[in-house]
A protein has these predicted regions:
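C-terminal segments that line or cap access tunnels to active or ligand-binding sites in enzymes
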Residues: 206-221, 283-285, 290-520, 526-540
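Extreme N-terminal leader/targeting segments of oxidoreductases
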Residues: 1-25, 43-51, 69, 551, ...
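Rossmann-like flavin
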Residues: 100-207, 219-220
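Beta1-alpha1 glycine-rich phosphate/pyrophosphate-binding loop at the start
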Residues: 1-3, 37, 41, 45-85, ...
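N-terminal glycine-rich phosphate/pyrophosphate-binding loop and immediately adjacent elements
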Residues: 13, 19-149
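Amphipathic alpha-helical segments that form well-ordered structural scaffolds
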Residues: 89-96, 182, 228-239, 440-448, ...
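Helical element adjacent to the flavin cofactor pocket in flavoenzyme catalytic cores
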Residues: 203-285, 289-291, 303-304, 309-319
Length: 597
């Protein structure tokens, strides 16, 4: 497997891999990673569909990319997905997956046209004082110390950031900047999250720094991620004869190490209450989704808080399977699951879905986002953060294009909200969010969008239906780590197995993204089948001088460097540098970026 860039490799079709007709594949998990692995086995590996088996414990494919309606409780959306124009593997996949809504076009075409006609951007990024615009005004407000610390983090080798928290590499002044408000609420980082992962994010998305304050860098699907992404991919695979076997609770993969050649020999699973096995030969390829950020999700509804009695550090079936596999390693080559699942107080947050058709509530929404959510277009354009809830629930909410579900009533609006601090009291509801019913969570949200307090209780009870989801491991992959804590996609010496998903290690890319999961799926197939075509490399904006200069300009709130407060020595050095670059292409680049006038 090798990486490539450019259209030469991207547009080419690889030759059929040697002996692929003799091979079979068993894919554990049907999240984006597993479905993508199956896609590349079919399209580029040219494996027969009937040789590909997807093993899924649940009754529905999609993993964490779900979206569903419970006929007794209402709509549930555990989370949403933000996409980027440089999700290279994602778009390589969906350019060949037919749309299930628009005949004759691909999912990518449909998505591209949608976001061209209805581009995403926010008109209010944050509020204070019950729905008033916080006027972040697209500014980062980075002080010099914070800006220098971010620059240092950007340039620090990953090895030097292993097992470090963000709070260990950034100054106290950073936490009060707009940059941190944007960053934390958009990506769900915490101060105790991995400094290594924050560095990866900075490097990966430096080309989008101008679109960070108003989300103009983002693109969204038409419907929820299940109907817009998972379902078309499942239909594609089924059309090619791929089998999805539901109710398959995989407990272990037995791996034998034969003088450094590591061979998966058996899959152990439970089906219909009985333990069974699948015996494997070297031509049977196994793709293992190790760990799951939505494991042990706890659901609540309008009148019930989620039951958290089963939440314990390290508890969860996906972690149990990974631990069983990791215990077979001689030198830790299958990762260290305990690093990610042993502190639910650090890794949890909670989301809720509010369904309403109430005109009065919708008017309060429109006062903030300046758009009518019933028009079928971008509404909030990303999350609206309640800035004065930072020391409380730290609430953010969003309304994507409506309807979010094809079955949704045309007058209904679905609001998704989430809280980073589930253990703290709300500003209005004096309870921890995790202890609240859906109705109580709705009250807190109504308070923050400006509904008068005397109307809140009645509207939350009679005009809204709120479902909730507490996720103890949703931020597990943000835990401080070292490279070896996640297994390589294909560990050294592995003959017929790979790890895929958010807890497999691949260079440079960032977790908590659709692209990361899909990339591991592609890399695993290309490695095990030795497909002779390049895997598109992670977009290299951190290596592009033009992008870096542009990022500097926006990071200092669109000011020329001459307007920055500098010491006498720094001013003298700047004069020397400007004299050296005068009349060169460097001067032109500095002018184009806005750093000099």
């Amino acid at each position: 497997m090798y990486y490539s860039a450019g259209t030469y490799e991207a547009f080419a079709h690889p030759e059929k891999p040697k002996d692929v007709d003799k091979k079979s594949a068993y894919i554990i998990g049907t999240g984006l990673a597993g479905l993508t692995a199956a896609f590349y086995l079919v399209r580029d590996g040219q494996m027969k569909g009937e040789h590909i088996h997807l093993l899924e414990k649940l009754e529905l494919a999609g993993g964490s990319c779900d979206g569903r309606k419970d006929i007794t409780k209402g709509f549930y959306m555990r989370g949403g997905r933000e996409m980027d124009n440089h999700f290279e593997v994602m778009w390589d996949t969906f350019r060949d997956v037919p749309s299930i809504e628009t005949p004759g076009v691909s999912v990518l075409d449909e998505y591209y046209w949608l976001n061209k006609h209805d581009p995403n951007y926010s008109l209010c990024r944050a509020t204070v004082n019950c729905g008033k615009d916080a006027h972040t005004d697209k500014k980062f407000e980075l002080d010099k110390e914070s800006a220098m610390a971010l620059s240092k983090l950007f340039l620090t080798p990953e090895k030097d950031l292993e097992d470090k928290k963000i709070s260990e590499v950034l100054p106290d002044s950073f936490w009060s900047t707009n940059f941190w408000l944007y960053w934390q609420t958009m990506f769900a980082f915490q101060r105790w999250s991995s400094a290594l992962e924050m560095k990866r994010y900075l490097c990966r998305y430096v080309h989008h720094i101008d679109g960070l304050p108003d989300f103009s860098a983002l693109r969204f699907t038409k419907y929820n991620q299940y109907e817009s992404m998972i379902l078309p991919l499942v239909k594609y695979l089924e059309a090619h004869g791929v089998r999805i076997e539901y109710g398959m609770d995989v407990k272990n993969v037995i791996i034998k190490d034969d003088g450094g050649r590591k061979i998966a020999k058996q899959i152990v699973y439970i089906k219909d209450g009985k333990q069974q096995t699948i015996d494997l030969i070297e031509d049977d390829l196994v793709f293992i989704t190790n760990g799951c950020c939505t494991d042990t999700s706890c659901y609540g509804d309008q009148t019930h808080a989620p039951d958290l009695s089963g939440v314990k550090n390290g508890f969860g079936e996906s972690w149990d399977m990974w631990k069983a596999i990791a215990a077979q390693a001689k030198n830790g080559e299958y990762g260290n699951p305990d690093k990610f699942c042993s502190d639910v107080d650090a890794t949890n947050w909670m989301s809720a879905t509010v369904a309403t058709s109430d005109d009065e509530i919708i008017r309060y929404i429109m006062n903030i986002c300046k758009r009518d959510p019933r028009m079928g277009k971008v509404t909030t354009g990303g999350i609206v953060t309640v800035k004065d809830s930072t020391e409380n629930w730290y609430l953010s909410w969003t309304i994507n294009r409506q309807p979010q579900f094809k079955s949704q009533d045309k007058n209904m609006v679905l609001v998704w909200l989430y809280s980073l601090n589930t253990n703290k009291e709300g500003n209005y509801v004096k309870k921890a969010m995790r202890d609240c019913t859906g109705e109580e969570i709705c009250r807190e949200w109504l308070y923050h969008i400006g509904v008068p307090t005397e109307k809140i209780n009645a509207l939350a009870k009679n005009s809204c239906n709120t479902t909730t989801c507490y996720m103890p491991y949703i931020n597990a992959f943000f835990q401080p780590r070292k490279e070896s804590d996640r297994p390589k996609v294909v560990p050294d010496g592995a003959v017929n197995f790979a790890f895929i998903g958010q807890f497999a290690e691949t260079p440079r890319d960032t977790i908590f993204t659709t692209e990361y999961s899909m990339r591991t799926g592609m890399e695993s197939v290309y490695t095990l089948l030795d497909i002779d075509r390049g895997v598109p490399e992670v977009w290299g904006s951190k290596y592009f001088v033009r992008e870096l200069l542009r990022a500097c300009y926006y990071a200092i709130d669109k000011k020329p460097i001459t307007d920055i407060k500098l010491s006498f020595k720094e001013k003298m050095l700047l004069k020397v540098v400007m004299k050296k670059v005068k009349g060169t292409d460097v001067e032109l680049l500095l002018k184009e970026s806005g750093l000099i006038e």
